[in-house]
Amino acid sequence: MPRTTRHHGRWTIADRIASAWHYLPVEVPAGSCGLRVGLEYDRSAAVLDLGCTGPAGFRGWSGGARRSFAIAPDAATPGYLPGELEPGTWQVIIGIHQLPPGGVDYRLTAEVSSRPGELRPEPVPAPPPPLPPGERPPPRQLPARPGRRWLAGDLHTHTVHSDGAQTVAELSRFAAGLGLDFVAVTDHNTVSHHRELPAVAARHGITLLPGQEVTTAGGHAGALGEVGWIDFRLPADSWLEQTQRRGGLLSVNHPIAGHVSWTLPMRGRPPLVEVWHWSWLDLRWTMPLAWWLAWDPGAVPVGGSDWHRPGSDAPPGTPTTWVECAADGPAAVLDGLRDGRVAISGRRDGPVLLRSGDEMIAVDAEGATLVGPDGPRARVRRPRESFPGAAGHQRLLDDTGATLALTR
């Protein structure tokens, strides 16, 4: 019979003012083999985030995407880390994200078992097979420096490890079928997906960049690289310090995006800014550019689809972030990002603008206008055309003034 701990009460606006995160203790005896936690509340009226720490630290996060989770030595609900259940006091984290004026009642039940197999997560779907030969689009040949090539990718995607609908394998197969060379898997406030990435990447022939979208009510940031878990409860400057110290890169994600715009103060400046995101709904708007240039014109602009699920989102690679790399693999992509060898296009097969030495090269952009910080510079007449280089950000615009491609 599992050992059961129950907590119940009412979260109010006063609780949210006191702290965004609250902790409900669960005692885990030595020899425990399974933990299962369930949270009940009126989901039509409120949004409560769910996560967990053990005596040794972080064990998982699912935000508002799940009502329950389970952890066992050899398996865990996506978003959570399998492994030994350390004896001692565990803490279930409740994030108060959204409340009605009168608050919301909640009931939390935690079960702990010492019987192997009694409390286990639901089984995961069988992985899809790799794409058959010929179903993957051929690589796009863009002009690059000797020994390098431009890789097409997406720096912002989600899976079932947070609030996405696809497994890591399903996302990888889908992205490979779209012709992408790399994808950063950036699930919210968790790194439980990282352990899957190398094997899935090898199976589907795509580079999978470890990532975490550090997610708070004041803004989201993409921590890229094998940097471990970044504690979203700490100030944003600590995210930058931890990511850089561990060899990764931090991006301010969708800084102008409705209620998830960036409002967090920082002394430092992350090296990347997600200038192009699906929330750039009208590509004639210049607000994302204005924010980037006011925040830090030296930051490298990148793009991300923020992919979650088929049927409701633009597909991965919308926009496409191009990175000039000396090799395949996560380290090469990070090196290219760090060096600023980046360009963004609205889609993988769309117009691209590349900086090459003292030149700007427009590819597949006939009819577009090359525009610099001071205004229009030239009309593109040919499928591949070079122009004198110039300082500052450069864009390709269509005749309506919509951005087609962007580079620094």
Question: What is each stretch, according to the model?
Answer:
Residues 31-39, 81-105, 390-395:
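Noncatalytic modules at the cell exterior or secretory-pathway interfaces
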Residues 136-146, 217-229, 259-408:
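Charged catalytic cores and adjacent phosphate/nucleic-acid-binding surfaces used
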Residues 137-269, 274-289, 304-310:
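A metal-dependent hydrolase metal-coordination microenvironment
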Residues 1-40, 112-118, 124, 141-144:
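Solvent-exposed, flexible loop/coil segments flanking beta-strands in beta-rich domains
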Residues 48, 100-111:
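Edge beta-strands of jelly-roll/beta-sandwich modules across compartments, strongly enriched
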Residues 23-27, 79-81, 380-390:
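Exposed aromatic-hydrophobic patches
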Residues 110-111, 125-130, 401-408:
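Short beta-strand elements
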Residues 3-17, 40-77, 87, 121:
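Surface-exposed beta-strand/loop patches in noncatalytic accessory domains
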